Swiss-Prot record:
Signal peptide: 1-28
Function: Acts as an electron acceptor for the thiosulfate dehydrogenase TsdA.
Binding site for heme c 1: C37, C40, H41
Gene Ontology molecular function, alphabetical: electron transfer activity; heme binding; iron ion binding
Keywords assigned by UniProt, alphabetized: Heme, Iron, Metal-binding, Repeat, Signal
Pfam families in the record: Cytochrom_C, Cytochrome_CBB3
UniProt name for this protein: Thiosulfate dehydrogenase electron acceptor
Listed PANTHER family: BLL4483 PROTEIN, CBB3-TYPE CYTOCHROME C OXIDASE SUBUNIT FIXP
Protein modification: Binds 2 heme c groups covalently per subunit.
């Protein structure tokens, strides 16, 4: 007697199989917990820009581990990630952070904004707005915004939607854990228009800094 298999189950299995089929060769080294990450962050850890899910690939190991802990203890307010992070043991957090930190980021940047928005985004990212006490992004996140150390992650390779959402989260206090409260202080001084402009400009930058971009600060 043939057993009826619900179409929903067939589609779910097919989707999961497709995700694993598309996974990078390094997926063989992935910890089991990473299987829960790919639906939002992708098999290569580059996120889903359209949905606002961030890039994880190549971010600092300690930074990634810290973010999982912040989600678990509420320092970062996100219902989905809180539910994912709370059950993880310290060893599982370390394994996930180590794995994603070693993935090589890839992909194309978003289209460059035009007009006044592009000019304002570039100004804030490379020079800041010192009259309002807003330092340039590259002062902490490095030339090309590719990240510096464990506390200042790469901004390039992230979507405009994600960057904008995080600045707003720093501003309203739903995200914390920043060294010395730096991002909270900076975000409070930024207008919504500035937040959107710098997010769009950063999302349009290449994963590797160009000489011209690095030399403008």
């Amino acid at each position: 007697m043939r057993q009826f298999i619900p179409m929903r189950r067939v589609l779910a299995v097919a989707t999961l199989g497709a995700l694993f089929w598309a996974a990078p060769a390094s997926w063989a080294a992935a910890p089991p917990e990473a299987a829960s990450c790919i639906a939002c962050h992708g098999a290569g850890g580059m996120g889903n820009p359209a949905a606002g899910y961030p890039r994880l690939a190549g971010l600092p190991e300690q930074y990634l581990a810290d973010q999982l802990r912040y989600f678990a203890d509420g320092a970062r307010n996100n219902a989905v990630m809180s539910g994912m992070a709370k059950p993880l043991s310290a060893a599982q957090v370390t394994a996930l952070a180590t794995y994603y930190s070693k993935l090589k980021p890839s992909g194309k940047p978003a289209p460059m904004p035009t007009g006044a928005a592009a000019a304002e985004g570039e100004r804030l990212a490379l020079r800041g707005d010192w009259e309002k006490g807003i330092p340039a992004c590259i002062r902490c996140h490095g030339p090309g915004a590719v990240g510096v150390g464990e506390n200042f992650p790469a901004l390039v390779g992230q979507s405009a939607a994600y960057i904008e959402a995080q600045i707003k989260a720093w501003k309203d206090g739903s995200r914390s854990g920043d060294p010395l409260g730096l991002m909270h202080t900076v975000a409070l001084r930024m207008t919504d228009a500035q937040t959107q402009a710098v997010a769009q400009w950063l999302a349009a930058q290449p994963l590797s800094p160009t000489k011209s971009a690095s030399a403008k600060h």
